Amino acid sequence: MSENLFGLTVATDKGLDDLQCQRLLSENRRYQEVMLQYRCALKALESRLEILNEEFSLQHDRNPIESMKSRLKSPSSIMNKMHKRGLPLDFPTMQANIMDIAGVRVICSFEEDVFFLAKCLKEQSDIEIVTEKDYISRPKPNGYRSLHLTIRLPVFFAEKEIHVPVEIQLRTIAMDFLASLEHTIRYKKNLPINAEIETELKECADSSREWDGKMERLLHLMR
């Protein structure tokens, strides 16, 4: 069986892995042009966050950002997501519907830093907020906490300006630690999650929330 993948006719009887997709698309100029937009959007967003971090550090003698990590979705991950949603595999559809091709995870020291950075980004006049999901104020049933923003920000090229979507996850060190371990347990170990494991994970999530609360109170006491 053959299928049109972003302008390429490809045999897909046995499926495609990341390496095969990358090889196929590496010579596709349109794919390279589109992914350049997302890479540049990540650089532009990271630059804005670094500026906010430096300004805050100068004013308050501490950094709100502990670390940042950016990523681009792999070709096969994009294709799988489009397949699941029944979308045609073409670039206009991808750009209009897949909002998390580019992503940045921002790890903060304290909960208040998360909301401070989100507020600063939302107040920048050329950033459009597409979606906002506050899992800190309203955690998921399993205890997961994080603040998710999907934004569009302008990227300036020699002859054009393009507004590119980027997903941002803002969380504290405790939130990130728990989310990373839970991801390992749930998805990488391929183990069935029973009620006992669910209960233990929820208790860990509650403990991490208490930890963040205590650290926030300590921060206020030291001011």
Report residues per predicted region.
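Terminal, regulation- and interaction-focused segments at domain boundaries
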Residues: 102-107
